[in-house]
């Protein structure tokens, strides 16, 4: 049936800024996905309300977190998605605090203890990173960190993308080469998903 959505993607913006470079990058990926008929939602961690992990280890016995906040809704949306993309800017050489706090709250899903919760099988993950610095090493560390998170959740990493030298919004928005490269990445991933 024409117009029917067979794949769903959840794109997670881990930047403290709602409308900065990370949002622009995810927007380009979302456009490419939508053009290929992939149902796409962008979720900004900055507007979600969740506390830090308490380290209480209750989830080691119950596979559930004792804290009730927006983490459960985020995980529900991840559970419903076929593809999950997480984008983080470089903050002091790594992922943002918002993303780290969310990852820590996913401890009920850690295979390091039994019982543990699990997302449905077959999900694919895309990691994206941005940095103000020109040195790509920090972006590569961000990508590796996100991919490790995916693997522990049973999500198969399928692609990653990074761009360096983007401190201000103009550094990305006024750089046709970087915009075209990011749009091309989104298009190629969308093609691979709907083969």
Predicted feature locations:
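Active-site donor-binding loop signature of nucleotide-sugar glycosyltransferases
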Residues: 45, 130, 163
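Sparse recognition of residues in long alpha-helices and their boundaries
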Residues: 38, 115-118, 166
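N-terminal beta1-alpha1-beta2 submodule of the flavodoxin-like/Rossmannoid cofactor-binding fold
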Residues: 1-109, 158, 169-195
């Amino acid at each position: 049936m024409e117009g029917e959505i067979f794949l769903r993607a959840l794109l997670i913006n881990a930047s403290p800024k709602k409308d900065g470079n990370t949002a622009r990058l995810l927007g380009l990926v979302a456009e490419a996905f939508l053009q290929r008929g992939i149902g796409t939602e962008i979720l900004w961690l900055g507007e979600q309300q969740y506390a830090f992990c308490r380290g209480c280890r209750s989830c080691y016995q119950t596979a559930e977190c004792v804290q009730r906040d927006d983490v459960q809704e985020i995980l529900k949306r991840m559970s419903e998605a076929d593809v999950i993309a997480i984008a983080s800017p470089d903050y002091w050489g790594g992922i943002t605090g918002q993303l780290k706090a969310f990852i820590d709250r996913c401890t009920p899903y850690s295979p390091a203890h039994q019982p543990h919760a699990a997302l449905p099988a077959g999900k694919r993950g895309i990691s994206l990173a941005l940095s103000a610095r020109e040195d790509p090493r920090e972006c590569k560390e961000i990508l590796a960190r996100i991919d490790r998170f995916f693997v522990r959740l049973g999500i198969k990493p399928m692609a990653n993308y990074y761009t360096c030298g983007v401190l201000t919004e103009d550094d990305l928005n006024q750089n046709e080469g970087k915009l075209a490269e990011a749009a091309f990445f989104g298009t190629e991933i969308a093609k691979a998903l709907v083969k």
